[in-house]
Swiss-Prot record:
Keywords for this protein: Cytoplasm, Initiation factor, Nucleus, Phosphoprotein, Protein biosynthesis, Ribosome biogenesis
Protein name, per record: Eukaryotic translation initiation factor 6
Organism, as annotated: Neurospora crassa (strain ATCC 24698 / 74-OR23-1A / CBS 708.71 / DSM 1257 / FGSC 987)
Job of this protein: Binds to the 60S ribosomal subunit and prevents its association with the 40S ribosomal subunit to form the 80S initiation complex in the cytoplasm. Is also involved in ribosome biogenesis. Associates with pre-60S subunits in the nucleus and is involved in its nuclear export.
InterPro entries reported for this sequence: eIF6
Subunit structure: Monomer. Associates with the 60S ribosomal subunit.
UniProt family annotation: Belongs to the eIF-6 family.
Amino acid sequence: MAVRAQFENSNEVGVFSTLTNSYALVAVGASENFYSVFEAELQDVIPICRTTIAGTRIIGRLTAGNRKGLLVPTTTSDQELQHLRNSLPDDVRIQRIEERLSALGNVIVCNDHTALIHPDLERETEEIIADVLGVEVFRQTIADNVLVGSYMALSNQGGLVHPKTSIQDQDELSSLLQVPLVAGSVNRGSNVIGGGMVVNDWMAVTGLDTTAPELSVIESVFRLGEGAAPGQINSSLKDTMVESFY
């Protein structure tokens, strides 16, 4: 299921929200409509937490997370951290990171198995990412951009990358991540994929300007049209994991 939404007249959905397979974060704000888009799809499935990070609403650009964990910048207040701990499932690890490149959502893109990170992140940060999120970590660029989190959206099913990513780079990234990748855009031609959409294994939210062709590319690469629902995804994933293991 791919749906379109706006946060207070902004199409940059990925700036104001974070979506994983075990929780969603949505910025505090007057945009009740934006929150209700998440609520309609996720209400009985995973918790949706309304929050600020470091007193700001650009939570999608400041945080990075997956099913197992959530990374927040060191500027996150104690109250915000406590609110996240109270709202998210107990088995999700929440960790503050002391990192110069503190917009973590711009410099990290991950699913439940792999993370791509900005080439200049601290070695210590890389270790924390691997530990808290339980992923393999690779230092990469996307179409020669170091902001991997801004120019890519990734789930366990597939990934959408910057439209100028070469075929060779797509193949290399695809073999690292072990998921199919497509070069494309969101919000009527925007190449800032990470800022323009959020996705998990059964749902994507994109900006209201996203065109029908863009939406169909998103639905096909992330496999969202195949009767996707949380329960079915897990069983099909388990089957493929078992097959690839043997």
